[in-house]
């Protein structure tokens, strides 16, 4: 019959700190390992894990030949009125929408590019 991890953890949780320290020392000797991890190596590991970006910004760089289609996309995406959307499009390069998720940003960029505009996600 083998001992499960849960049984081992339950047994360790009932031990005193002094006995746990002795157990760790015995494990280190038995398997020729060290439990000493320097703070610098832990920080290095954490620094290597890149943070995934969750908020994106879509920027309109150039209108292209189909200005009316771009204005329609801006109106439907931002909820702005016709005049505000037109002014926004004519002020390119400009930010269209900020703090949106990746899927929405990709969709908006694709729609703008399909309509002849130049757009980017930042």
UniProtKB/Swiss-Prot annotation:
**What is the protein's species of origin?**
Buchnera aphidicola subsp. Cinara cedri (strain Cc)
Q: Which UniProt keywords apply?
A: Ribonucleoprotein, Ribosomal protein
Q: Which family does it belong to?
A: Belongs to the bacterial ribosomal protein bL12 family.
InterPro entries documented for this protein: Ribosomal_bL12, Ribosomal_bL12_C, Ribosomal_bL12_C/ClpS-like, Ribosomal_bL12_oligo, Ribosomal_bL12_oligo_N_sf
Q: How does it assemble?
A: Homodimer. Part of the ribosomal stalk of the 50S ribosomal subunit. Forms a multimeric L10(L12)X complex, where L10 forms an elongated spine to which 2 to 4 L12 dimers bind in a sequential fashion. Binds GTP-bound translation factors.
GO MF, one annotated term: structural constituent of ribosome
> Which GO terms fall under biological process for this protein?
translation
A GO CC term attached to the entry:
cytosolic large ribosomal subunit
Supply the name of the protein.
Answer: Large ribosomal subunit protein bL12
Task: Name the HAMAP family for this protein.
Answer: Ribosomal_bL12 (MF_00368)
Pfam families reported for this sequence: Ribosomal_L12 (PF00542), Ribosomal_L12_N (PF16320)
Q: What is the lineage of its organism?
A: Bacteria, Pseudomonadati, Pseudomonadota, Gammaproteobacteria, Enterobacterales
Its biological purpose is as follows: Forms part of the ribosomal stalk which helps the ribosome interact with GTP-bound translation factors. Is thus essential for accurate translation.
């Amino acid at each position: 019959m083998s001992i499960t991890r849960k049984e081992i953890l339950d047994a360790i949780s009932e031990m005193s700190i002094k006995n746990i320290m002795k157990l760790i020392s015995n494990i280190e000797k038995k398997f020729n390992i060290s439990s000493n991890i320097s703070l610098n190596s832990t920080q290095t590991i954490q620094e290597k894990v890149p943070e995934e970006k969750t908020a994106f910004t879509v920027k309109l760089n150039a209108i292209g030949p189909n200005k009316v289609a771009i204005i329609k996309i801006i109106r439907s995406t931002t909820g702005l009125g016709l005049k505000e959307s037109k002014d926004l499009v004519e002020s390119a390069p400009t930010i269209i929408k900020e703090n949106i998720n990746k899927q929405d940003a990709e969709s908006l960029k694709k729609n703008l590019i399909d309509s002849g505009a130049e757009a980017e996600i930042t």
